[in-house]
């Protein structure tokens, strides 16, 4: 039996709800998608619960599930994935965090959790922090830039713990939180103390940074703090090839996703101009995926722009990103052709009016290039896909891909 190549396209935060300004259509309903519409004619489709109905997924736990890795068994926290994706090489005992460059006032009250989101000086600020903070109380500290305002921090030393709380309050108008131990161990208490000292040191350095003085002169918010969250120690994950026998590559610009994919053994490629934002190189990513399909059994293509727009409440931005998804699919079909399996879905819903993740199911489409009993679905959107035959969980996705690509192993005799 011929085995087919696989394209798995995940648009971050794709799922949505009816939007008042769109005459109560969802963003997917409001955008014409001719290329995806053609795929629907020979697809099975429906809705997917990334974790389980009603559970609000993080992008980390949902991607693990979609890749066939049970997050309830393996998930320890997001920080390690972010750090690996940003270029860190973690070792046992290290504690990693994800963070944002943010803006606070003199009392450490948060004004903007993302410092206006646009922090062109982020790499230079990271370099400045690394040059001025080598260690805190004997614990080695290293900063890594991710994308835009995002940063990862790694603590290295003996006797550290990831059982500590965030310094990020997750809202504005309140003070930066003090990290606290979440268990009674000495290691957790020491790590929380180090993190609090680190936070104060970061503020002192960034507040006096010439780079931030220039930002203020330009009328921009200073990036004068790093809000930290998602403490996690390194955990070995199953390798994708070991449980699928599929050689896979990933196309992504997002540190978290790059970290997960790297850790499970995918070859990660970030094309020139891919940013993880609305200004990303959409077509360049599609072209890179098409090229990789000639070399690998499966290519995972990730797009962050839909989620970024949703978190900002940017309706027009989400509509634009969705229109570009259709163009990306069209570009893959132009270059590689249609003789492959294509799955299109989201990792979670981020309704543009809510601006946060929700536990809503997300759209799911699986196109095959041969005769199947296709679903009678007219459009790729949240309402139409309720007519489809599928209501699956994230952990089901890999099995579906293996089955329809004829790469499965029989269960039983």
Curated annotation (Swiss-Prot):
GO terms for biological process: glycolytic process. Its EC number is 5.4.2.12. The keyword Isomerase applies. Disulfide bonds: none annotated. It catalyses: (2R)-2-phosphoglycerate = (2R)-3-phosphoglycerate. InterPro entries: Alkaline_phosphatase_core_sf, ApgAM_prokaryotes, Metalloenzyme, Pglycerate_mutase_ApgM. It is an enzyme of class 5 (isomerase). One of its GO terms (molecular function) is phosphoglycerate mutase activity. Catalyzes the interconversion of 2-phosphoglycerate and 3-phosphoglycerate. Belongs to the BPG-independent phosphoglycerate mutase family. A-PGAM subfamily. This is 2,3-bisphosphoglycerate-independent phosphoglycerate mutase. The gene is apgM.
């Amino acid at each position: 039996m011929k085995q087919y190549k696989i394209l798995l396209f995940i648009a971050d935060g794709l799922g949505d709800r009816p939007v008042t300004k769109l005459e109560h259509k969802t963003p997917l309903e409001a955008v014409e998608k001719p290329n995806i519409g053609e795929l629907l004619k020979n697809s099975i489709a429906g809705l997917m619960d990334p974790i389980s109905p009603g559970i609000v997924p993080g992008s980390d736990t949902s991607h693990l599930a979609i890749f066939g890795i049970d997050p309830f068994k393996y998930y320890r926290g997001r920080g390690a994935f972010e750090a690996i994706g940003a270029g860190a090489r973690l070792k046992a005992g290290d504690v990693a965090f994800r963070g944002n460059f943010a803006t606070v006032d003199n009392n450490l009250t948060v004004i903007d959790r993302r410092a206006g989101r646009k922090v062109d000086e982020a790499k230079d600020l990271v370099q400045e922090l690394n040059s001025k903070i080598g260690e805190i109380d004997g614990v080695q500290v290293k900063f890594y830039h991710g994308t835009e305002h995002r940063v990862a921090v790694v603590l290295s030393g003996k006797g550290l713990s990831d059982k500590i709380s965030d310094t990020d309050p997750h809202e504005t108008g309140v003070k930066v939180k003090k990290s606290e131990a979440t268990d009674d161990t000495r290691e957790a208490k020491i790590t929380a103390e180090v993190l609090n000292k680190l936070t104060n040191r970061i503020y002192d350095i960034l507040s006096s940074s010439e780079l931030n003085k220039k930002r203020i002169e330009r009328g921009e918010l200073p990036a004068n703090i790093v809000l930290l969250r998602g403490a996690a120690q390194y955990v070995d994950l199953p390798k994708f090839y070991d449980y699928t026998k599929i050689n896979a590559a990933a196309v992504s610009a997002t540190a978290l996703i790059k970290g997960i994919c790297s850790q499970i053994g995918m070859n990660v490629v970030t094309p020139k101009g891919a940013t993880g934002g609305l200004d990303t190189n959409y077509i360049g990513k599609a072209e890179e995926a098409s090229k990789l399909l000639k070399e690998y059994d499966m290519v995972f293509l990730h797009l962050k722009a839909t989620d970024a727009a949703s978190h900002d409440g940017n309706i027009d931005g989400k509509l634009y990103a969705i229109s570009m998804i259709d163009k990306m699919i069209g570009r893959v079909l132009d270059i590689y052709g249609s003789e492959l399996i294509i799955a299109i879905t989201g990792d979670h819903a981020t309704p543009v009016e809510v601006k946060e993740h929700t536990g809503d199911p997300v759209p799911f489409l699986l196109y095959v290039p041969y005769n199947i009993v296709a679903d009678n679905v007219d459009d790729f959107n949240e309402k139409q896909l309720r007519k489809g035959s599928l209501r699956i969980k994230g952990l089901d996705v890999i099995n579906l891909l293996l089955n329809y690509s004829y790469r499965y192993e029989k269960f039983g005799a």
